[in-house]
Amino acid sequence: MLLTICVFLVALIGITTAVLVYLFTPPSHFPKDIPTIPFYYALLPLVRDNDQVDLYRKYLERPLTESGAVKLFFGGRWNILVRKPAYIAEVLKNEDIYAKSGNQVKIPHGVLAEYTGENIISAHGENWKLYASIFKPGLQQDYDPARVWSNASLLVRLLDETQAAEGAVNVNPILQRYTLANLSEVLLGSTFETLQSPNAPLHAFQLRIKPKIFDPVFLNFPFLDHLKLPTRQEARKVVREFTDELCRTVQSGHSTCHEKGQHKHKNLGCRLLSAFETGILTEKQLQHNMISAFLAGHENPQLLLISALFLLAEDTDTQERLRTELSSLGTREPSYADLQSLPLLTAVIYESLRLYPPISQLINRRTTHPVLLGGKIPIPAGTYVGYNAYSTNRDVEFWGETAEEFNPERWGTTMDEINALFRRANARGSFISFHGGRRACLGQKFAMLEARVTLAKLVLETAWEVDPLWVRRMTPAGPLYARNLRLRFCRIRG
């Protein structure tokens, strides 16, 4: 009996030691000449309320900036996190070596994998080419901005009503409703009715599902999803209900808008449904790509608008100069061609994206074979590699000593100058808010349309400033943006 207990204790100690070694130290075959970020860095948001910019400054900024890459524990494994623009450019250029590898590969047993599956963002190889053939024409066509202008008018009305009722506006939930409306009505050819009701089903689902999907405990220790815990079973149930509701809502908006299989030159929703009806996509592929379109199609524009409003609220001089530029067009609803010609408007959007990229950190690439990053960092096959866009976009060597400051004029004063700098920064890996290479953001064109029209409407009809009672803090984890941003709006008449 005593011998059995001793054997059990020795085994328990051995297993515990092995787990701790695995968690606290990178694998022995990882590169030795780049810093290791303390294991607990990823866990700090679990134990106390943090501002993730403060955490970045304290733990990540110096080693990442000085070495260009670090070893980072995230998502239940050790990864290589890249920051140096030249390294970023190499990763983005060589997609066959640094292959996309999403949650369906990384944590196939996880709730998050059940939610997103394989999709246009996470797929690699032939499946990605298949999805891209459906998405690209649906996202990159010239959409009529009329619906966005109409929704922007509803947005201004909501801001007015909230300002009058509460004395300030928490803009984040309102902007979520707004970007969901644009996604559904413009890209998906349906309507989620999120601007008409704060309790619209898909908006309510999002409020329920986000805390379950992005629970930091399960994000950092995804092996726990192997356990059939009641809370995770409930999360899986909500995922299935949300997926069914999303597909049903989009399908209902297309009952008379297209003939079976006639998806060419149609909106994205029509193309996805037609691809499913003709057998190009399976039901699972339709569902996962619909989820991907839903998430990227509203969250990224929402985060861009939050950051732009935040920066313009802090810099009211730039806000006023932007108002002057827009007023020079002589109308409250300019043509989109005229909006595209405005240098300051474009520069404000790019500068907002530079300082606060909607996806501030992304680790979703996996090496297909051993590689020497930058000719000097050996990375084994099967290693997950990611990048920190928040850090890379503030690279002093490219952007200068004022890289931390909001300065739209750095982009140039003419559209030719701005476009040239945009192309150069992208090519050099110094501006990666839209990622880059073959896998650059397919929704960039629509995101710019939505941002231009929305900011034009808001700047021409309202002025805003930061609510003095708002505590200036960024989110503790996940997407990096102003937490619970509260602004005071004043309507401009005439």
Identify the residue ranges that each predicted region occupies.
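Cytochrome P450 heme-binding "Cys pocket" and the immediately downstream C-terminal segment
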Residues: T316-T318, A440, Q444-Y481
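Cytochrome P450 heme-thiolate monooxygenase catalytic core
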Residues: K100-H109, Y143-L305
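N-terminal membrane-proximal hinge/A-helix region immediately C-terminal to the signal-anchor transmembrane segment
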Residues: L2-T116, I121-L130, P145, W149-L158, ...
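C-terminal helix/juxtamembrane-tail motif
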Residues: L2-T4, L480-G494
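Short, small-residue alpha-helix embedded
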Residues: N300-A313, T454
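Cytochrome P450 I-helix active-site segment
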Residues: I34-T36, P201-F205, E259-N267, F310-I359, ...
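Conserved cytochrome P450 K-helix/beta-meander segment immediately N-terminal to the heme-binding cysteine loop
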Residues: D96-I97, Y387-L421
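Cytochrome P450 heme-thiolate "Cys pocket" and heme-binding signature region
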Residues: T116-N119, I291, A296, Y336-Q340, ...
